[in-house]
Amino acid sequence: MAIYTCVLLDIDNTLLDFDAAERQALTDMLAEYELPHDEHACAVYHQVNRELWDALAKGQMNKQKLFQVRFGRFMQAMQLPDNGKGKAMNDRYEELLSTHADLLPGALTALEELSEVATLAIVSNGAAAVQAHRIAASGIDRYMDGIYISEKIGAAKPSAKLFEHALRDLGITNRSRVLMVGDDLLADIKGGINAGVDTCWYNPRNVENKTDIAPKFTVGSYEELYRIVMEPEELENLGVRNRRHSNEALL
């Protein structure tokens, strides 16, 4: 039996390449509105967006407000006149974002291996419609025992409520065997800590942790994650077990 029998997973930049999706959707949308869409514009948007999502994680803003003000703040930061189309720009950006579901290298193999030994579930703060489309398009849904999006649940990471809903729905009672894996310290790791489960910071870029948030584990690859989740005998059987989802993959 695995060391961790339930693994909760973030989506963006943990399983799917959100940075690439964000950049493409953003530049396409800005081009449609005949606005600057160069590297500088992308960097400004990323900073504005990061600040807003951090405010959401701290309980200072809800998601509806975030989506309403995001591109108005961007226009202001770019020193561009407010065109009054911030909400329409956001809607178009989200629509374009939903069409991008690029997997990070090795993600499907990792899910295939982990799903052999543990209950897997997604816990995400993304927009429900966008994430649902990206999850289905990427094929990661077939490995999941549950998918929990904050917009549907009514609570966002790092609130323990989202995690508690997921664990209750999954029938998980022993939190000592639960591991939360994600790339965002404030949302994923702090959220897991708030929920009383062990945490693993997925940090393939070796970003410095400048916060006081302390994950139990830090990994730079899925292979390192295997060694945290699996018992030694399970590690020896990587790639050779009967596939729990093999028939589904052929449908």
Give residue ranges: language-model regions:
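A short, Lys/Arg-enriched amphipathic alpha-helix followed by its capping loop at the start of a domain
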Residues: D28-E32, A110-V117
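N-terminal helical cap/lid subdomain that shapes the substrate entry/recognition surface
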Residues: A2-P105
